Curated annotation (Swiss-Prot):
InterPro entries in alphabetical order: Acyl_CoA_acyltransferase, Leu/Phe-tRNA_Trfase, Leu/Phe-tRNA_Trfase_C, Leu/Phe-tRNA_Trfase_N
Catalytic activity: N-terminal L-lysyl-[protein] + L-leucyl-tRNA(Leu) = N-terminal L-leucyl-L-lysyl-[protein] + tRNA(Leu) + H(+); N-terminal L-arginyl-[protein] + L-leucyl-tRNA(Leu) = N-terminal L-leucyl-L-arginyl-[protein] + tRNA(Leu) + H(+); L-phenylalanyl-tRNA(Phe) + an N-terminal L-alpha-aminoacyl-[protein] = an N-terminal L-phenylalanyl-L-alpha-aminoacyl-[protein] + tRNA(Phe)
Keyword Iron part of the UniProt annotation: no
Protein name: Leucyl/phenylalanyl-tRNA--protein transferase
Origin: domain of life: Bacteria
Tagged with keyword Cell membrane: no
Keywords, sorted A to Z: Acyltransferase, Cytoplasm, Transferase
Subcellular location: Cytoplasm
Source organism per UniProt: Psychromonas ingrahamii (strain DSM 17664 / CCUG 51855 / 37)
Length: 238
């Protein structure tokens, strides 16, 4: 069976309507274009994100189901509350973006490759320099042991990847993101694809249409820029 995948031109940042995304593979919408900040921002504003491996063209996705959570509804399990109460780590925002994305890009387990390619790292580094992409860092004894990064569109945070060098440190980073984003009236966190790891926090799937309705509601409501100042943050055991 031959699949038709629209190829994006270099000279404009228009995307096909997300309703045209394939059902198999689920959510594949287009290929090509580039990873310019303008195109990536336009993609996120429409519920689209890039995801591809080395050797593949740039692939753009908008899955039929989207994993999302309102940050004020994050669930902290009793086991995580015990870990948090020990308070043997520190948390920061945008102190080590490049180190976080490098750690997220490292192959895991039996994997020999990563979808966070050199070109993707360079693209998100540009977004970080423009104040669009941000990182949460978890430190223990001044060593980076966990974290995550993503893109903020209005009052929606689009999470891209997270990592742990010690048990539970990516979970700590996610809880910290939710609490901090909620403090600054962030409305929605887009986790893209649902996993058991995310489900434990209360992340749930919504249909693409519902997600895009939320996105359209919140993407033009900008939060206070102080949310993303370089700073130390604290996690509440609640």
């Amino acid at each position: 069976m031959t699949l038709y995948i629209p190829e994006l031109p270099i000279n404009n940042t228009i995307f096909p309507d997300t309703s045209l995304a394939l059902s198999d593979p689920d959510g594949l919408l287009a290929m090509g274009g580039d990873l310019s900040p303008q195109r990536i921002i336009k993609a996120y504003q429409q519920g689209i994100f890039p995801w591809f491996s080395d050797g593949q063209p740039i692939l753009w996705w908008s899955p039929s189901q989207r994993a999302i959570i309102q940050p004020n509804l994050v669930h902290i399990s009793s086991s995580m509350k015990k870990i948090i109460s020990k308070n043997n780590f520190s948390l920061s925002i945008n102190h080590a973006f490049h180190d976080v994305i490098d750690a997220c890009a490292a192959p895991r387990g039996n994997q020999n490759e990563t979808w966070i390619t050199f070109d993707m790292i360079a693209a998100y580094q540009k977004l970080h320099q423009q104040g669009i992409a941000h990182s949460i860092e978890v430190w223990r004894d001044n060593k980076l042991v966990g974290g995550l990064y993503g893109v903020c569109i209005g009052s929606v945070f689009c999470g891209e990847s997270m990592f742990s060098k010690e048990d539970n440190t990516s979970k700590i980073a996610f809880i910290a993101l939710c609490q901090h984003f909620d403090k600054f009236k962030g409305q929605l966190i887009d986790c893209q694809i649902l996993t058991k790891h995310l489900q434990s926090f209360g992340v749930q799937n919504e249909s693409r249409d519902n997600f895009i309705n939320y996105l359209n509601q919140y993407k033009n409501i900008n939060i206070n820029k102080k949310c993303w100042d370089k700073q130390t943050i604290f996690i509440k055991n609640r």
